[in-house]
Amino acid sequence: MPHSDELDAGNVLAVENLNIAFMQDQQKIAAVRNLSFSLQRGETLAIVGESGSGKSVTALALMRLLEQAGGLVQCDKMLLRRRSRDVIELSEQSAAQMRHVRGADMAMIFQEPMTSLNPVFTVGEQIAESIRLHQNASREEAMVEAKRMLDQVRIPEAQTILSRYSHQLSGGMRQRVMIAMALSCRPAVLIADEPTTALDVTIQAQILQLIKVLQKEMSMGVIFITHDMGVVAEIADRVLVMYQGEAVETGTVEQIFHAPQHPYTRALLAAVPQLGAMKGLDYPRRFPLISLEHPAKQEPPIEQKTVVDGEPVLRVRNLVTRFPLRSGLLNRVTREVHAVEKVSFDLWPGETLSLVGESGSGKSTTGRALLRLVESQGGEIIFNGQRIDTLSPGKLQALRRDIQFIFQDPYASLDPRQTIGDSIIEPLRVHGLLPGKDAAARVAWLLERVGLLPEHAWRYPHEFSGGQRQRICIARALALNPKVIIADEAVSALDVSIRGQIINLLLDLQRDFGIAYLFISHDMAVVERISHRVAVMYLGQIVEIGSRCAVFENPQHPYTRKLLAAVPVAEPSRQRPQRVLLSDDLPSNIHLRGEEVAAVSLQCVGPGHYVAQPQSEYAFMRR
């Protein structure tokens, strides 16, 4: 039955009275209630709200993916205008018909790329599969188009990446592959669920511009789900604000930012961290917590000094980590990824040192190498006077009680067969620290500290939103009262209010227990708020390191200035520069086996502030 007369000529999507529920303990739990919206051709609708507000399940309902997970979906109308201009009712489509709609007419970029990519197929095969299915292209044509899409999302060495597997890529690289796959068939509607969460600010800025360019070319409608109000200001035409499963406010981006009507919208905007807010302050500062009842922003008191003078708790010297690349008929190692090259730094008790840089710069690999989750090929890692890099497996296991890791992808780091209570208790059991009754009380306390309920201990990972899963991972890392926590994008998946709560929790624990943090992040506004010192990484090497004040208020290296300039600002009227989207000029950290890369030489430009020397900087930036 044709539905063209039911959809306005300019619209590509219309939803009326969408209701979503899940069954739990024989009870129906409502996730979304009476949600209605439309999307015009060439328009970007941003759906914003806290974790668990119903944003992602709304997107999954549109894609007809919720029924498989036990979701109950009811809707008066869910109309889509396909690329062929035919209008279909999505709720009436069979599973076979939806397979032709997904990808070709409506594509989705998922929040967690590691769980969305198939680990047994190469990147090229996965992108090409979608192109062959929906565009009737040959294998050769599909691979050429796949390479072109990787170029468009600014992946260096795109030809090489085509033959790599998802586990061989960084989180940001995987997210860019997901974006390339979703855009490869030029759909009528693109649903982007936190598509730039795992990306550094420079790549995020380029991806946002890329989506806008392709949107203009194809008159594509975009639903952009995010918690980053800076991104909303940069990309959205209209904004839909959700709270506890309901739409509380909708309007143009200018109306929402300049004249918000609902208290929750005002609270969301007040909670956005602003780059430059820490100017003149020496120590990290807690985030102001905004609630629906008290939306007015009140700055928290200034923090006290937590860094303990004396010997560093962690000392890293000339750390080198490389990954082999095989090729040829004999599958020999011919090239290597120089992920980390001669990195050195110290970390003191009670200090937060942030590692920042683009995806693939070596931040996460550095963090993993410290715990020997990846093996290093050179350098020294010393914890409390003891060499980590030479420890036996048995002694290393005991040491991991004192150094904990919070991973970037929360779903991939939780066992789907275990309740979250069991996942949090597991490290306590492994180290024999607490009996069952005390361990259960510890789990309840940890869940409350990260903003969850004690009864959540009996649920499984798939029953939580992405932000809630990240909070579970943080609770697990805190279970053993470690001396050092390596946090790899630990708050990147969280909305602004929960992110503030978690950062405040980390600062409280640092103040109470003297925990040292190695904070790996691409969110410069959060880094500015939490850090004592900042190290900027580029192609596996540190090019600038110093106090937070020095790096943010007086950046010396061109790359540091580039990172700061790319940070999205929560002001829709701000003029934004156009960015070049070509990837041919991107440098690469892949080199022939045995080839040595010159280490940058750092020079002191101020107290504790070191920057790559100009003579080595030019060669380094060009490589």
From Swiss-Prot:
GO MF annotations in UniProt: ATP binding; ATP hydrolysis activity
EC number from the UniProt entry: 7.4.2.10
Places the protein is found: Cell inner membrane
Lipid bilayer topology: Peripheral membrane protein
Listed CDD domains: ABC_NikE_OppD_transporters
Record's catalysed reaction(s): glutathione(out) + ATP + H2O = glutathione(in) + ADP + phosphate + H(+)
Gene3D superfamilies: P-loop containing nucleotide triphosphate hydrolases
Name used for this protein in its record: Glutathione import ATP-binding protein GsiA
Organism for this UniProt entry: Shigella flexneri
